């Protein structure tokens, strides 16, 4: 990745963070809705990396909420930051890790996410996942068995 691509990615991360701040708290956090919610909060084609886009995805887990085992498009590199609460995560059959607010992790193309869940049964958790992915990729979360 060249310097301009890194600059574009940095600007995209800043914009995605601002978008998440603007989204605010949803009913998922008050326990009146499904235990998880996924929303695309930012997307922009990278003009200096033809065919690639940056997409910000806000994942919200109510207390005890989780996502089914999944993977992502083969082109997807993901940088994730926990915004609130704590997230349990397992990638490629490795150890289950717990990431707390302010901590981050990455997923690489082809990784399998076996566990993605709120680590708490009593408080909500939010995660911002920033994808660098083929622009043509529409489904960012794909099931696997």
Language-model features, listed with the residues they occupy:
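Glycine- and acidic-residue-biased ligand/ion/polar-headgroup-sensing regions
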Residues: 74-94, 101-103
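C-terminal region of N-terminal signal peptides and the immediate post-cleavage residues
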Residues: 20-34
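Extracellular/periplasmic catalytic domains that process cell-envelope and extracellular macromolecules
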Residues: 49-52, 73, 81, 98, ...
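Bacterial N-terminal signal peptides
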Residues: 8-18
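Short acidic-glycine-tyrosine-enriched beta hairpin
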Residues: 46, 50-51, 61-63, 93-111
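A short glycine-rich, His/Asp/Glu-containing loop-to-beta-strand
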Residues: 35-69, 75, 130
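Histidine-centered metal-chelating micro-motifs
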Residues: 66-68, 88, 104-118
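Ligand-binding loop in jelly-roll beta-barrel domains
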Residues: 95-96, 110-137
């Amino acid at each position: 990745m060249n310097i301009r691509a890194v600059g574009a990615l940095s600007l995209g991360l800043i914009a995605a963070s601002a978008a998440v701040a603007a989204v605010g708290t949803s009913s998922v956090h008050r326990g009146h809705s499904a235990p998880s919610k996924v929303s695309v909060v930012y997307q922009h084609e990278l003009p200096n990396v033809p065919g690639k886009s940056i997409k910000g995805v806000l994942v919200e887990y109510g207390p005890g909420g989780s996502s089914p085992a999944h993977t992502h498009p083969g082109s997807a590199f993901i940088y994730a930051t926990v915004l609130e609460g704590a997230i349990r995560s397992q990638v490629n059959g490795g150890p289950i890790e717990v990431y707390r607010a302010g901590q981050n992790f990455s997923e690489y193309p082809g990784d399998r996410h076996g566990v993605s869940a709120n680590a708490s049964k009593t408080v909500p958790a939010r995660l911002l996942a920033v994808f660098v992915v083929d622009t043509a990729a529409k489904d960012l979360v794909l099931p696997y068995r």
